[in-house]
A protein has these predicted regions:
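Terminal amphipathic alpha-helical/low-complexity segments used for targeting or macromolecular assembly
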Residues: 1-83, 192
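Serine/threonine-rich low-complexity intrinsically disordered regions
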Residues: 1-2, 25, 45-48, 59, ...
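Structural signal for interior beta-strand "rungs" in well-ordered beta-sheet cores
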Residues: 81-176, 180-183
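Generic C-terminal helix-cap and adjacent flexible tail
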Residues: 185-192
């Protein structure tokens, strides 16, 4: 019975595959698929990966619908639901390779987010007075972090759990605390 339902679900995903193949953002979706496959240690074709993650990961579905950015995503969401507690603002520009770790109650409202971005649950990236953060490449943001305002998070940064970041952070930093403090820069511990 389970395998029968699985086959039915795969048939329902055919419109997703067609839209993926015709998407102007296909290269970004491919980067996302590669990152997810690497993290989950899954080796399949791109179409196989797409079917797998659309079937098993509502957070991936949310990212996929964000990448489609057309009317069809609303129709697809009627029968193949996205994660409704994971919000990506439609004006946020996100490069490829986004990976999520259970993004329950996570809001991404940045000006832009670079490649190979990782985000955990309960994270808020938001605006103050219309100014939104810019996030660099290879940035990891962990549980409960808050990043707000017109600030820049540099490349290769990690924002620790519960950190509240209201000031720009340079490249290659590890940041923790409320208010956020840099504890490592370029791999070297910083004494505050």
């Amino acid at each position: 019975m389970k395998s029968f339902l699985y086959v039915i679900y795969q048939v329902l995903l055919l419109p997703h595959i067609i839209l993926y193949k015709r998407s102007k953002n296909r290269a970004l979706i491919d980067q996302d698929l590669e990152r997810w496959a690497e993290a989950k240690k899954i080796n399949k074709s791109k179409t196989g990966l797409l079917l797998y993650f659309l079937t098993h990961a509502t957070d991936f579905r949310t990212i996929f619908y964000f990448r489609l950015n057309n009317l069809y995503k609303h129709i697809l969401n009627f029968y193949c639901r996205k994660e409704n507690r994971f919000t990506i603002d439609i004006t946020t520009k996100i490069k490829g390779g986004i990976l999520t770790g259970h993004p329950y109650c996570t809001i991404l409202n940045a000006d832009s987010i670079g490649e190979n971005f990782y985000v955990n649950h309960l994270v808020t990236i938001g605006e103050i007075n219309g100014k939104r953060p810019t996030i660099g490449n290879n940035v990891n943001i962990y549980t409960g972090a808050i990043i707000i305002g017109g600030i820049t998070i540099g490349n290769h940064c990690s924002i620790g759990a519960g950190a509240v970041v209201t000031k720009s952070i340079p490249d290659n930093c590890v940041v923790v605390g409320n208010p956020a403090k840099i504890i490592k820069k370029d791999g070297k511990r910083i004494e505050n």
